UniProtKB/Swiss-Prot annotation:
Positions bound to UDP-N-acetyl-alpha-D-glucosamine: T10, G11, G12, N126, S200, I255, Q300
Pfam families on file: Glyco_tran_28_C, Glyco_transf_28
UniProt record similarity statement: Belongs to the glycosyltransferase 28 family. MurG subfamily.
Function (record text): Cell wall formation. Catalyzes the transfer of a GlcNAc subunit on undecaprenyl-pyrophosphoryl-MurNAc-pentapeptide (lipid intermediate I) to form undecaprenyl-pyrophosphoryl-MurNAc-(pentapeptide)GlcNAc (lipid intermediate II).
Record organism: Lactobacillus gasseri (strain ATCC 33323 / DSM 20243 / BCRC 14619 / CIP 102991 / JCM 1131 / KCTC 3163 / NCIMB 11718 / NCTC 13722 / AM63)
Membrane topology label: Peripheral membrane protein
Pathway given in the UniProt record: Cell wall biogenesis; peptidoglycan biosynthesis
Recorded GO MF terms: undecaprenyldiphospho-muramoylpentapeptide beta-N-acetylglucosaminyltransferase activity
Keyword vocabulary terms for this entry: Cell cycle, Cell division, Cell membrane, Cell shape, Cell wall biogenesis/degradation, Glycosyltransferase, Membrane, Peptidoglycan synthesis, Transferase
Gene encoding the protein: murG
SUPFAM superfamilies associated with the record: UDP-Glycosyltransferase/glycogen phosphorylase
Disulfide bonds: none
Principal location: membrane
Protein name: UDP-N-acetylglucosamine--N-acetylmuramyl-(pentapeptide) pyrophosphoryl-undecaprenol N-acetylglucosamine transferase
Amino acid sequence: MRVIFSGGGTGGHIYPIMALIERLKERKLVTNDEILFVGTDRGLESKIVPAAGVPFRTLKIKGFDRKHPLKNFETIELFIKATKEAKQIIKDFKPDVVVGTGGYVSGAIVYEAAKMHIPTIIHESNSVVGLANKFLAHYVDKICYTFDDAAKQFSEKKKLVKTGNPRSQQVLGLNKDNVDLAKKWGLNPNMPTVLIFGGSRGALAINQIVEKSLPELETKPYQVIWATGQLYYGDVKKKLAGKEISSNVKIVPYIDNMPGLLPQMTCVVARSGATSLAEFTALGVPVILIPSPNVTHNHQMKNAMDMEKAGAALVIAEDDLNPNNFVSSIDHILLDTNYAKQMSEASRRLGVPDASDQVISVMEGLIKNK
């Protein structure tokens, strides 16, 4: 099987592809020479993909500027040029199937593949369908999705296949060494513990609310691991310098083994990006979600509301955050074992433990019938 994957810009577009590639190799359905990732030289993919040893090509393309419409003439020019380059990449590589996960770069390569009558698939990992996937839905053969709310936004109902997010299966299959809480941080592995983090770089609003809530959190009969993110760690340590922090609170810059830590957490406080939610639901971790307001179409809030509707999360909008609702939400989960158990079960029901295999099955079906 020869496959071109394309997605760019954010982790939500890249990690599902990386999970699929890993699973395809595990099942010996592809060699490294039979896959190609097409992205941009500016997005996260330009670092993540080559670092993983996956063959990588780039297209020069950019998104529409909603605030300055006149600048979009250049965007259209770039897209037309990118489709010509995409056509050449496809001719040279000769894929059996092309898979896009969103981002403008996937628009060019998947669109061109569909015009060339090569089997095409898009995967939507968020509750709100992105512009590239909305555009491509008319041309592709199949649309894989994670959230039911996303399915409602596609008019091409016959193309829809609910597969879940491939990252779910990857997290479950990782040979994870559980983090030794006692050895690493002097914590009690038998005590309820909450992990609070705002992604690898951190989130200022989350750090600010933890800082304000710290005096109360220090009095609680549970443990707190606060991962500030690399960007904010120095500032946080400076602000707290000279203050004696209670032994039930550990402040760290980042978590280097998330899959080894998550199964031991009673609860997690986090943003609601698609990749994080795939990890939480795969492992059945109760979550308090504080969606980032700085994303297109407010999709993190929609993702979070879907989780809350299913009973798998509590949601606090960033603008509504205060020490009272923040700490009481953590208390609600950590001090009520029945409620935490119900949330965990609801979360697991949302997870798709064989999501990668389901997407691969769609790929194989299209190749077989072409």
